[in-house]
């Protein structure tokens, strides 16, 4: 390392250092003399898994290029070690993460370059950290050991010299040195043909891009850039045979060199360069960040919004019978299924080019609910409607995007629709997973037969034919400039090793007042050209297929109140779109895995809407991954099964099997699944047995499942999570029922008794944990006593255990949540939340807190992102445009939780009194006009149908149809009443067996009139 060196810490004073060790992990900091300085020892014990942090307050203004250096040694095997820089909030972190950090007995150098310290998390996403307030060293993993450090230094590696410049020839008035100056100075060659301009830096310097400003009257016909290697040889890093625009920005990520050579061919004219500039390492530490830097320098709209480090929301489209998933974002960028590339629209009207940043943007769905999204550009005198659909299935699938350009002016006008294929994706870089996100390199583009072949794999065909097609190596502004005057095919093929190949198709039309034109762009796999040949019918056919697939919603509300039901249908459709064959997965790009908890939640949600087959297919596919001892993987994806200790899986699997059979009896499915369910039960019992030893008798862990990481907050340090236990309670009850269905009454009684025993231990544990931690709410785990209302909600919804838990603790839990939600509404002192909170709706209504439940429901409905697409990300940020991780979008598990919450507002089963509760979450505002209609809503007792409406200020009418099998505890009718119930008639006969809010029905059909308030 060369540069200005500063000693930051000789480790002779431990006072600035702080040891942080969450959970069961331990960390001791100590130091010892070592020559002229000291050694800092981090003695750590990570127990079964966790992390420790040594933090030092250290306010530093960092130079443009730098490196931290230390020496290290130690013992303890291989761990993950992180070197982190933190700002004053301690919430924004940049880090180097070494996942293979090995320790040995000898001192070895530890060099941490600025370019290796990257943004990790927080709200201040920047590539270069200019100032830090603390330094952290974290050790992650398991086991124990010692990490020893000495001699912490900061080296300033910035380049402040002036390069030596020479040219192959130069006019006397315009010498080579002029390229380092400012306009109007410039270098001009004295000769024609290829000329060279060489810059010698005098020492190695870091840069990541070269900016070349050309003279507008002397643009070259070709140019190339060479950089000098450490051994003095020149390597070509860029070559172009196309005439550039006034400025060329050549991205050269992570370049360190002692010299640069520009080769310029001015054609018949002499070569000329106005200025050459070098971008620092953080301008383009990689290809994506370089493009993002260029986007920030360009006018808004020239590049996709996400490249300008602003959030861009997207949604999915897919065929009702297919498996491909395409994306469209709110700006109209369409990403093909598989994420291979995307298509961007631009509109030229006269001399003006319109981009997404120059128009009003509107989002919509077909029928206001189908997964057939549209984006409308509203420009001056025109609109552009962008509507992608997936057609067909398997090898015969295709993406068809219809661009409808409409003229709204009073006189004819000529427009040009320009479709660009550049290496950009809808999926932002902050969503990157397994190489997907931000960009998709385009190495090869070929123009053929009115379309393009992309990377030798995908074909984009257009109807009608384009008026011009342009292909080039530059993915920046020069493509848009080339499209403006292009005629015919400008280039038939382009290859680019850097992956920056791009192409554009131009469609010019003169439109009269009120006229429209449709342009279709169809993307198929290589060799597949006619998935659905009639472009005009493709979109209507896709809509009809989705209407047929979703059927009629089992819930109907007044026209002005339809949003909850429309969102229900969209949520169901998104589950179907995001799936891959039998694999139900929560997202289209980032979460393309079948997490069992997500998948069962999605499958049971569809089953509640009458679509049981996806749940059965899921379980038949997932079941064979089970091991002989009953162990289940927590997740399965393209790489196979994942075997993390996530013990919620067992209750979830059993619940999925039972729900499928309760909602659609199927003896063959029962026969297939009962042996697996028995093995799941055996595994569940063996897990619980680990906490039945005498050593746990007087602890809060007795009788529970072992430590687990099924909750994301417990990944670093597994704990006894009550989430797992409530799922286990549900699973035990369900497998007892399954045993009875399988004809094993003895086993059914044994398991039912086991469920009662487990419930008793669970309640005792909760009481002990609350006392230990001194809390009045239901905790999320034994060890932490943590507040987690979203997880605890399943105690009332999934586990149906509300009657057994202390009411005061339940109210305290959800009162605290509601206070947090209210604070979010009234302040800016929060950053993000997760719409998993929709689970709390079902918990609140089961507590009889209808108004609170509806307040949460309506608040979350109002925060769909965007509202017109009726979807939620996993993470919703206060700053709508913050370039922050969303999880995935649409997040189908959240959509499934919404389906469960909304359907339970109309009907839910109650275990302890064997009843079916109706209308406990119905909003009184829904009773106006035609009121509420429930048609064949799936329940454990058969399809439920009823109607509910307000007759006048004091009377509510309800009609429950026959056809359902009445449960032993009857139907508990709990409609929204304007005042306490005063009188009630059933089929015209007065009844007196009611309370202030409900009546229990034991015979159908029943026509009930609820009379409320004081005597008239």
Language model features with spans:
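Trp- and acidic/polar-enriched beta-sheet ligand-binding modules for extracellular glycan
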Residues: 152, 192-195, 205, 216-282
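Active-site core of glycosidic bond-cleaving carbohydrate-active enzymes
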Residues: 595-616, 623-627, 675-682, 726, ...
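Active-site acid/base region of carbohydrate-active enzymes
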Residues: 469-470, 474-480, 552-572, 596, ...
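Aromatic-rich carbohydrate-recognition surfaces in CAZymes
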Residues: 407, 432, 446, 453, ...
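Extracellular beta-strand ligand-recognition surfaces/modules
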Residues: 2, 11, 68-70, 109-152, ...
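Disordered, acidic Ser/Thr/Pro-rich linker "stalks" and the adjacent N-terminal cap
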Residues: 19, 26-35, 41, 155-207, ...
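Terminal accessory carbohydrate-recognition/targeting modules of carbohydrate-active enzymes
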Residues: 268-271, 275-559, 563, 911-1016
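Extracellular ligand-binding interfaces
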Residues: 44-123, 143-148, 211-239
């Amino acid at each position: 390392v060369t540069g200005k060196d500063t000693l930051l810490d000789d480790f002779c004073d431990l006072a600035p250092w702080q040891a942080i060790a969450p959970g069961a992990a331990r960390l001791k900091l100590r130091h010892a003399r070592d020559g002229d300085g000291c050694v800092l020892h981090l003695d750590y014990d990570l127990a079964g898994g966790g992390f420790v942090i040594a933090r030092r307050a250290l306010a530093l203004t960092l130079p443009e290029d730098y490196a931290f250096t230390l020496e290290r040694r130690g013992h303890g095997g291989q761990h993950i070690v992180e070197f982190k820089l933190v700002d004053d909030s301690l919430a924004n972190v940049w880090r180097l993460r070494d996942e293979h950090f090995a320790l040995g007995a000898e001192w070895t150098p530890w060099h941490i370059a600025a370019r290796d310290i990257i943004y990790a998390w927080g709200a201040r996403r920047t590539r270069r950290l200019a100032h830090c307030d603390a330094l952290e060293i974290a050790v992650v993993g398991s086991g124990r050991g010692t990490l020893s450090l000495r001699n912490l230094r900061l080296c300033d590696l910035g380049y402040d010299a002036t390069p030596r410049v020479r040219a192959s020839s130069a006019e006397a008035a315009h010498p080579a040195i002029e390229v380092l100056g400012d306009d109007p100075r410039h270098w001009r060659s004295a000769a024609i043909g290829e000329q060279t301009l060489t810059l010698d830096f005098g020492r190695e310097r870091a840069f990541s891009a070269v900016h070349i400003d050309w003279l507008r009257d002397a643009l070259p016909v070709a140019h190339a850039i060479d950089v000098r290697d450490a051994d003095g040889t020149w390597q070509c890093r860029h070559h172009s045979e196309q005439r550039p625009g006034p400025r060329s920005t050549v991205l050269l990520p992570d370049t360190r060199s002692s010299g640069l050579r520009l080769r310029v061919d001015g054609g018949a004219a002499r070569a000329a360069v106005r200025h050459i500039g070098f971008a620092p390492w953080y301008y383009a530490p990689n290809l994506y960040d370089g493009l993002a830097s260029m986007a920030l320098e360009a006018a808004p709209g020239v590049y996709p919004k996400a490249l300008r480090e602003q959030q861009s929301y997207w949604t999915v489209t897919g065929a009702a019978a297919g498996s491909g998933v395409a994306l469209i974002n709110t700006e109209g960028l369409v990403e093909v299924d598989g994420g291979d590339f995307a298509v961007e629209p631009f509109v030229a009207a006269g001399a003006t080019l319109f981009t997404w940043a120059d128009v009003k943007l509107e989002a919509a769905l077909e029928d206001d609910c189908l997964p057939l999204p549209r984006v409308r550009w509203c420009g001056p005198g025109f609109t552009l409607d962008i509507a992608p659909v997936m057609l067909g299935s398997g090898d015969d699938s295709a993406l068809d995007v219809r661009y409808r350009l409409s003229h709204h002016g009073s006189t004819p006008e000529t427009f040009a629709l320009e479709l660009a294929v550049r290496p950009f994706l809808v999926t932002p870089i902050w969503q990157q997973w397994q190489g997907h996100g931000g960009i998709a390199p385009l190495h090869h583009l070929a123009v053929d037969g009115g379309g393009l072949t992309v990377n030798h794999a995908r074909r984009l065909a257009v109807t009608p034919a384009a008026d011009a097609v342009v292909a080039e190596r530059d993915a920046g502004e020069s493509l848009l400039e080339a499209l403006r005057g292009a005629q015919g095919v400008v280039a038939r093929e382009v290859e680019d090793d850097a992956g920056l190949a791009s192409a554009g198709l131009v469609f010019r039309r003169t439109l009269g007042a009120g006229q429209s034109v449709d342009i279709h762009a169809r993307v198929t796999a290589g060799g597949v050209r006619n998935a659905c040949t009639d472009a005009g019918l493709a979109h209507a056919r896709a809509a009809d297929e989705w209407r047929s697939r979703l059927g009629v919603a089992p819930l109907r509300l007044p026209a002005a109140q339809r949003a909850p039901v429309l969102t229900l249908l969209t949520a169901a459709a998104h589950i179907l779109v995001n799936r891959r064959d039998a694999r139900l997965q929560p997202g289209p790009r980032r979460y393309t895995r079948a997490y069992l908890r997500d998948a069962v939640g999605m499958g049971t949600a569809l089953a509640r809407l009458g679509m049981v087959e996806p749940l059965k297919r899921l379980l038949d596919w997932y079941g064979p991954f089970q091991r002989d001892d009953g162990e289940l993987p927590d997740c399965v994806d393209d790489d196979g099964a994942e075997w993390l200790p996530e013990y919620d899986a067992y209750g979830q699997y059993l619940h999925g099997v039972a729900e499928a059979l309760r909602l659609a009896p199927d003896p063959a499915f029962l026969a297939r699944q009962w042996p697996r369910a028995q093995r799941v039960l055996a595994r569940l019992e063996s897990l619980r047995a680990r906490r039945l030893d005498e050593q746990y008798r007087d602890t809060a862990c007795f009788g529970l499942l072992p430590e687990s990481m099924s909750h994301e907050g417990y990944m670093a340090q597994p704990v006894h999570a009550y989430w797992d236990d409530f799922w286990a309670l549900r699973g035990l009850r369900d497998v007892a029922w399954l045993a009875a269905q399988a004809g094993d009454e003895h086993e059914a009684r044994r398991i039912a008794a086991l469920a009662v025993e487990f419930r008793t231990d669970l309640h005792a544990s909760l009481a002990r944990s609350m006392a230990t931690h001194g809390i009045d709410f239901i905790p999320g785990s034994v060890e932490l006593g943590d507040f987690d209302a979203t997880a605890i909600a399943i105690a009332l919804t999934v586990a149906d255990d509300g009657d057994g838990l202390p009411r005061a603790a339940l109210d305290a839990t959800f009162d605290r949540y509601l206070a947090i939600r209210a604070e979010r509404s009234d302040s800016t002192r929060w950053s993000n939340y997760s719409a998993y909170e929709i689970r709390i709706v079902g918990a609140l209504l089961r507590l009889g807190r209808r108004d609170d439940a509806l307040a949460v429901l309506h608040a979350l409905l109002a925060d769909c992102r965007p509202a017109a697409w009726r979807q939620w990300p996993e993470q919703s940020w206060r700053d709508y445009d913050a370039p922050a991780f969303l999880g995935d979008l649409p997040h189908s598990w959240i959509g499934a939780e919404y389906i469960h919450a909304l359907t339970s507002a109309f009907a839910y089963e109650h275990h302890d009194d064997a009843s079916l509760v109706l209308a406990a979450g119905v909003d009184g505002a829904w009773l106006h006009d035609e009121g509420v209609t429930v048609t064949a809503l799936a329940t454990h007792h058969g399809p439920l149908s009823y109607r509910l409406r307000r007759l006048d200020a004091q009377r509510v009418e309800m009609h429950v149809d026959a056809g359902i099998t009445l449960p032993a505890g009857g139907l508990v009718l709990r409609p929204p009443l304007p005042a306490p119930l005063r009188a009630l008639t059933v089929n015209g006969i007065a009844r007196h067996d009611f309370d202030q809010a409900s009546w229990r029905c034991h015979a159908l059909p029943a026509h009930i009139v609820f009379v409320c308030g004081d005597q008239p």
